[in-house]
């Protein structure tokens, strides 16, 4: 019992320290007028593919930077750098999530005054990422049609904390036989207050709604308004 209490106390201390650092990140981001978006999902849900399209299509409209978290390799960072955006790769080693201290270190690689939007592509994980505030304004959860209709019910904490849930790879919906009404219902059950979008980075379907959402949230940041209403 003593050991269990010690573990709980250590975890609470770690999360408390992370919360302090996240608050400092948030203060710094707001001083620069930045909209910061934390993108989370399981591996393979399409985070990098969506960011590739976003960087291409919003070039000249928003100044975008990206921080990419992975256990190993800089593959995703190189893909995004090819789109002309400033990108910093965060290699976490064995850590299954990003934390506020990693973001603070990565911030030093950017000229934040030259950015409008900062995307944080979190490590592909549906559990740990939900617990760590990074200083972001918005939490976006991606969920592909290939993952099964009940994914939101199996991992409710992540979905419950989302401001926006994006159903990705909708061009594959018919091929995989997914029950889209069930997908929507399960998202709504776990994330009743979240906005829901459906899109395909491959075909382009639904991307305009994503871009409109981003631009509206950026306007709110610059005007000091609340997000994701």
Predicted regions and their residues:
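Generic alpha-helical hydrophobic packing signal
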Residues: 65, 116-117, 163, 209, ...
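Canonical P-loop GTPase G-domain recognition
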Residues: 172-229
């Amino acid at each position: 019992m003593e050991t269990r209490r010690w573990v709980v106390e250590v975890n609470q201390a770690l999360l408390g320290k992370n919360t302090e650092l996240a608050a400092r990140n948030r203060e710094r981001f707001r001083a620069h007028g930045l909209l910061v978006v934390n993108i989370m999902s399981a591996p393979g849900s399409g985070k990098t593919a969506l960011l590739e399209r976003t960087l291409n299509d919003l070039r000249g409209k928003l100044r975008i930077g990206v921080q990419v978290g992975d256990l190993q390799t800089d593959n995703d960072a190189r893909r995004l750098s090819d789109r002309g955006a400033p990108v910093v790769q965060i290699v976490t080693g064995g850590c299954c999530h990003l934390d506020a201290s990693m973001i603070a270190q990565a911030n030093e690689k950017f000229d934040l005054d030259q950015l409008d939007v900062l995307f944080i592509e979190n490590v592909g994980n549906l559990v740990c990422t939900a617990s760590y505030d990074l200083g972001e304004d918005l939490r976006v959860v991606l969920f592909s049609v290939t993952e099964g209709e009940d994914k939101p019910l199996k991992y409710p904490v992540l979905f419950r904390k989302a401001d926006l849930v994006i159903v990705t790879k909708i061009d594959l919906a018919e091929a995989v036989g997914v029950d889209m009404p069930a997908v929507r219902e399960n998202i709504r059950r776990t994330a009743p207050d979240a906005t829901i979008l459906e899109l395909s980075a491959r075909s382009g379907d639904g991307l305009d709604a994503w871009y409109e959402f981003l631009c509206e949230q950026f306007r709110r940041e610059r005007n000091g308004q609340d997000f994701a209403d």
